[in-house]
């Protein structure tokens, strides 16, 4: 059993498993929900469909293209390091963490690269279709990342007597994210908590052996 589950195979298993789960969730959300439609699971957990163009401060075409190309370059670099780490025989837990980060980044790149041509626009009145006759909502590299997990664990108003924020609405945790984002976060947090000292050594070993 141990010979079958080599570090390389474990990495591949994580990559394919996370990627498949991530894309199944995103495609289902995209083809079954209206934009900004919400499904209540509990008071603190909602499925809330939104899309993230990845553009900051409203910057359009060139910013989006640059961001997608940057993501592709980043995931290529992470993939190269992951390959080197496996070849170097580093700790299995370390390989798992890097695999999670790599796969999460790759999952969001798929959205950015392909979703614009594979789906039409999601709106408040239209659910997107896969491979629509009229074409997709954007060209290659200009797709939007699908997000859906929303955890408003604390949803309340600040007490009126508090300075500056009194009476204002407060939500924790407000970001809406996807399965790929969760994989990235879990991988990075685990790396920092358990492999902070190993990462620097692994990086230099990978560079030296290349």
Give residue ranges: language-model regions.
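Alpha-helical transmembrane bundles and membrane-interface segments of multipass inner-membrane proteins
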Residues: 1-210
């Amino acid at each position: 059993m141990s010979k079958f589950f080599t570090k390389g195979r474990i990495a591949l298993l994580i990559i394919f498993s996370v990627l498949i789960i991530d894309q199944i969730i995103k495609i289902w959300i995209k083809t079954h929900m209206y934009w900004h439609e919400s499904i209540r699971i509990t008071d603190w957990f909602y499925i809330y469909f939104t899309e993230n163009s990845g553009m900051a401060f409203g910057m359009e075409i060139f910013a989006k293209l640059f961001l997608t190309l940057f993501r592709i370059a980043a995931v290529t670099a992470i993939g190269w390091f992951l390959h080197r780490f496996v070849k170097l025989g580093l700790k299995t837990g370390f390989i798992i963490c890097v695999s999670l980060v790599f796969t999460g980044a790759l999952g969001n790149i798929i959205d950015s690269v392909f979703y614009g041509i594979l789906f039409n626009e999601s709106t408040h009145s239209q659910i997107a279709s896969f491979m629509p006759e009229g074409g997709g909502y954007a060209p290659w590299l200009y797709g939007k990342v699908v997000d859906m997990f929303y955890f408003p664990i604390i949803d309340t108003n600040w007490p009126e007597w508090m300075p500056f924020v009194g009476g204002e609405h407060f939500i924790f945790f407000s970001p809406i994210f996807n399965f790929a984002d969760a994989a990235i976060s879990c991988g990075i947090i685990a790396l920092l908590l358990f492999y902070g000292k190993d990462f620097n050594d692994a990086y230099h070993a990978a560079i030296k052996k290349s």
